[in-house]
Amino acid sequence: MNYRKFLIAALLVMSFSVQAKDITVTRLTCEMREGRVTISDAPRLGWQMSSPENGTRQTAYEIEVRDVWAGKVVWNSGKVKSARSQLVSCADAALEKDRHYTWRVRVWDEADTPSAWSAPSDFSILTSEAAFAGSEWIGAITRKDARIPEGRKYHGSELKKPEAKAAWAAVDTLAKKSIYLRREFHVAKKVKDATAYVCGLGFYEFSLNGEKVGDSEFAPLWSDYDKSVYYNTYDVTSQVKKGGNAIGVLLGNGFYNVQGGRYRKLQISFGAPTLRFRMVVNYEDGTSETIVSGKDWKYDFSPVLFNCIYGGEIGRAS
């Protein structure tokens, strides 16, 4: 009988040991996005727990945040008794802005068994001023030179008025066109990491060395363009190569520049298609290089002959 009890106890210990070893934490997210993320305030983090045992549940977690540039841990949540695993706030961390961080997490199950630490993920807390420092808005033509009418009144019966028709007829046709913007740069050292910050209005498609970056078709998100605009951050470390590199950005009108054609509900424009861009390349030797949008960029017309958020698109066959 004692032998049976010993055997059962041993099997239970082995069972818990296997479970502890097999509990893993994956799919780390920051603001519900995987991969490198840039935010402007305290992050909200998420993860998934995986176990081969049915019914395994999280009862606690611990988060550790490291400042990459300082090379040290700057915050640890300690063991927090909670089943929460999504949108977990780090407001208590009081993390500094304009810094780059990595983070990892471990969890405990219902038997109070801890998992191993997850693989690290990363995020940056940057103000938009820091993200686009030194860059300029660029495009084929400025709003002033394009003679674009001001205001949001051009819809419905207002569009039929002679003065409205005359105002829109006077707009320079260059302000309606889709354009390509291009900038070349040279890399002579081994790249540690590279990050690009892109705001292309109304919509943009970003490519590096001829390959599209990201999978968005309508970036950035729409906004009240006279109040705020959104931008995207990309980890382009794997796409920057030694030697010559070329940045390409295709711009379209989107809701930023609705000038009508084929079909319309309204006409409103905040300006011709425009770009603000900054890329930071960090090298293994500790130096870095920054490429920003400015007067040294080149532009040309794209194969898109017509584009309107309501009227669709006409392209030139290659």
Where are these regions (language model features)?
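Short, solvent-exposed loop/edge segments of extracellular or virion-exposed proteins
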Residues: 27-35, 136-147, 164-165
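Hydrophobic h-region of N-terminal signal peptides that target proteins for export
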Residues: 10-19
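Recognizes extended acidic, P/S/T-rich segments that occur
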Residues: 56-100, 110-117, 133-143
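Pro/Thr/Ser/Gly-rich low-complexity, intrinsically disordered linker/stalk tracts
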Residues: 21-53, 122-130
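Bacterial N-terminal signal peptides that target proteins for export
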Residues: 1-7
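Accessory beta-strand-rich segments of carbohydrate-active enzymes
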Residues: 47, 81-82, 86-88, 99-104, ...
